């Protein structure tokens, strides 16, 4: 009885392995080839954030970190993390107080 279970387990494992191998051989190879992107497609893929690279000179840092992205907000006041956290906590407490029945 135990030998039958062991034999069935080996047969199942062999069947799964054969299925995996046959599916991997039949996978389309063309989709994994490198594409020749047009300049317009590269601009689309690059998006609004620009090219990002890691400089070999550690003093320069990432180009992404040195570029200031434009924002639509007219608010020029920089908000510190502690002020932002206090503001968020205040909003959450107000929402909780409004939901509580009296």
From Swiss-Prot:
Entry's induction text: Up-regulated during folliculogenesis.
Site (Cleavage): 35-36
Secreted is among the record's keywords: yes
One of the GO BP terms on file: glucose homeostasis
Leader sequence residues: 1-26
Keyword terms: Amidation, Cleavage on pair of basic residues, Cytoplasmic vesicle, Hormone, Secreted, Signal
Ranges in a coiled coil: none
Summary of the function given for this chain in its UniProt record: Plays a role in the regulation of food intake and energy metabolism. May also be involved in suppressing the anxiety response by promoting the expression of serotonin-related genes such as fev, tph2 and slc6a4a.
GO cellular component, one term: extracellular space
Gene: spx
Modified residues (Glutamine amide): 49
GO molecular-function term, one example from the UniProt record: type 2 galanin receptor binding
Protein name, entry field: Spexin prohormone 1
Phylogenetic lineage: Eukaryota, Metazoa, Chordata, Craniata, Vertebrata
Family (UniProt): Belongs to the spexin family.
InterPro entries reported for this sequence: Spexin
Tissue expression remark: Mainly expressed in the brain and ovary. Detected bilaterally in the adult brainstem. Expressed in neurons in the dorsal habenula (dHb). In the dHb some neurons project into the interpeduncular nucleus (IPN) where expression often overlaps with galr2a and galr2b. Weakly expressed in the liver, intestine, kidney, heart and gill.
The organism of origin for this protein: Danio rerio (Zebrafish)
Residues annotated as transmembrane: none
Chain positions listed as propeptide in the UniProt record: 27-35, 50-102
């Amino acid at each position: 009885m135990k030998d039958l279970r062991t034999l069935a387990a080996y047969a199942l494992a062999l069947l799964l392995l054969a299925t995996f191998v046959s599916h991997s051989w039949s996978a389309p190879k063309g989709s994994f080839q490198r594409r020749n992107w047009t300049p317009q497609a590269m601009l689309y893929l690059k998006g609004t954030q620009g090219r990002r690279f890691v400089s070999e000179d550690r003093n320069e840092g990432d180009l992404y970190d040195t570029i200031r992205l434009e924002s639509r907000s007219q608010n020029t006041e920089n908000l510190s993390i502690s002020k932002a956290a206090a503001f968020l906590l205040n909003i959450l407490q107000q929402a909780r107080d409004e939901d509580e029945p009296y």
